[in-house]
Regions:
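Conserved polymerase palm-domain catalytic core
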Residues: 1-111, 118, 126, 137
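Short, conserved micro-motifs composed of acidic
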Residues: 16, 20, 127-174
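Residue-level preference for nonpolar/small residues embedded in alpha-helices
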Residues: 112-113, 168
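Anion (oxyanion) recognition and catalysis
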Residues: 122
Length: 182
């Protein structure tokens, strides 16, 4: 069944259908290039397929040591997260269990995490959207105050298909909608 679905997608002529009708232009099999990839938007198998793909990507990230580890004082259990995701939007999380790690070291680890995530998404045929990308560094002083970006400088850079771009960094006091919530 899977082979039948993929072969059909790769060999058919694709048109776009909207409320205004079907597109006149189309794309389809290219005998001199690679076949179209993906399973198409609106495919009923899309959510399950993406869940299967992202579960492998998340395990790769975890195997590389990325994520957020903490101890829940309520449940008395260890928690380990790599990301929060919904459909094709994902928030990566990262912390260090080393109380002596510096903000600069954490930013360097976050850059490696971003490069790894971007590479894994690229391997699926996807790409990260710079305009939807932003990050926070939650750095707390011994006095319990949040450090500003000026106090803990650093940038994260998306490779962006060979056109590197600095991702917007927000102060912890600034909210931004993500995954449909604030």
């Amino acid at each position: 069944a899977l082979q039948s679905m993929i072969e059909t997608i790769q060999e058919m002529q694709h048109h776009i259908r909207t409320a205004f009708g079907d597109s006149k232009s189309s794309y389809g099999p290219n005998p001199t290039g690679p076949p179209p990839q993906g399973i198409l938007q609106g495919n009923g198998a899309g959510p399950a397929t993406w869940a299967a793909i992202t579960s492998v990507i998340i395990q790769c990230m975890k195997a590389e040591g990325f994520g957020f580890d903490a101890w829940s004082t309520i449940s008395q259990r260890a928690m380990s997260l790599v990301c929060f995701g919904f459909i094709d939007d994902t928030d990566l999380v990262l912390n260090s269990s080393d109380p002596h790690v510096t903000a600069q070291e954490l930013i360097e680890t976050a850059q490696r995490e971003l490069v790894t995530w971007e590479g894994l998404i690229s391997a699926t045929g996807g790409a990260l959207a710079p305009e939807k990308s932003f990050w926070y560094l939650i750095d707390v002083s011994p006095e319990g105050q949040f450090a500003s970006p000026a106090d803990s400088p650093g940038d994260l850079i998306l490779h962006n298909k060979g056109s590197p771009i600095v991702i917007e960094r927000l102060p912890v006091s600034t909210a931004r909608e993500t995954l449909g919530i604030w």
